[in-house]
């Protein structure tokens, strides 16, 4: 399969099944990180992932890591921590700060200036959302991602205190389900999401689920600025 070159003025994408097998899921190169292109990407099961200041790369991996409704796993140690957690969890109160914090990593980052600009614009349009974890007035953890109907595509998370990002994940996952959410897209499986119950499914199964659930209209109250319960 070829690696597709995107047109700067056309936000459409090739079909995800045309992605390369090696590296797994790499579909296209080029284009921009505009809100219009990002929305088209997530509607199609594609996301950007590349080194800052380089040409955008677009992916649709096979398999895909997901956490379906009702499958969240909370181990005994984490459950005990959540009952006693001294943190406050909020929704959509500090998106810009969350994506900035996610970009600061000792091991390097894929979140460069154009990614920040694109997702901040998408947040202003009500399509991208953040979860914040606070200890007093200090932002100590959080996550951000993109909503596609009854699917939430998690992009990145950060933690400056013990279990802070897990608190964000658990609180938001339960909140999203209460409003009819059906699937949390984790993109690529890692130890963090696997511990919370994420599994890998074939890309075709993910795309079928996305096609079905993206048509669902989630109550806009789901995305109001608010506090979330653990």
Swiss-Prot record:
GO MF entries: leucyl-tRNA--protein transferase activity
Keyword presence, Transferase: yes
Cellular location(s): Cytoplasm
InterPro entries reported in the protein's UniProt record: Acyl_CoA_acyltransferase (IPR016181), Leu/Phe-tRNA_Trfase (IPR004616), Leu/Phe-tRNA_Trfase_C (IPR042203), Leu/Phe-tRNA_Trfase_N (IPR042221)
Pfam family, one: Leu_Phe_trans
GO process annotations (BP): protein catabolic process
Enzyme class: transferase
Reaction catalysed by this enzyme: N-terminal L-lysyl-[protein] + L-leucyl-tRNA(Leu) = N-terminal L-leucyl-L-lysyl-[protein] + tRNA(Leu) + H(+); N-terminal L-arginyl-[protein] + L-leucyl-tRNA(Leu) = N-terminal L-leucyl-L-arginyl-[protein] + tRNA(Leu) + H(+); L-phenylalanyl-tRNA(Phe) + an N-terminal L-alpha-aminoacyl-[protein] = an N-terminal L-phenylalanyl-L-alpha-aminoacyl-[protein] + tRNA(Phe)
Function, in words: Functions in the N-end rule pathway of protein degradation where it conjugates Leu, Phe and, less efficiently, Met from aminoacyl-tRNAs to the N-termini of proteins containing an N-terminal arginine or lysine.
Sequence similarity: Belongs to the L/F-transferase family.
Name under which the protein is recorded: Leucyl/phenylalanyl-tRNA--protein transferase
């Amino acid at each position: 399969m070829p690696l597709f070159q995107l047109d700067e003025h056309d936000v459409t994408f090739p079909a995800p099944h045309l992605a390369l097998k090696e590296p797994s899921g790499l579909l296209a190169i080029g284009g921009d990180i505009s809100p219009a292109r990002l929305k088209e990407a997530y509607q199609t099961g594609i996301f950007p992932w590349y080194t800052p200041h380089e040409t955008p790369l677009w992916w649709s991996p096979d398999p895909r890591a997901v956490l379906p409704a009702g499958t969240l796993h909370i181990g005994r140690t984490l459950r005990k921590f959540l009952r006693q957690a001294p943190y406050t969890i909020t929704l959509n109160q500090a998106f810009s700060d969350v994506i900035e914090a996610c970009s600061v990593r000792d091991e390097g980052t894929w979140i460069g200036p154009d990614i920040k600009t694109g997702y901040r614009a998408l947040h202003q349009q009500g399509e991208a959302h953040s979860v914040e974890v606070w200890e007093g007035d200090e932002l100590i953890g959080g996550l951000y991602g993109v909503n596609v109907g009854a699917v939430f595509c998690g992009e990145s998370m950060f933690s400056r205190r013990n279990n802070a990002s897990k608190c964000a994940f658990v609180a938001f996952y339960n909140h999203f389900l209460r409003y009819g959410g059906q699937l949390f897209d984790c993109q690529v499986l890692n130890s963090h999401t696997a511990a919370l119950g994420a599994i890998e499914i074939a890309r075709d199964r993910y795309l079928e689920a996305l096609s079905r659930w993206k048509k669902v209209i989630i109550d806009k109250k789901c995305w109001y600025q608010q506090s979330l319960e653990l």
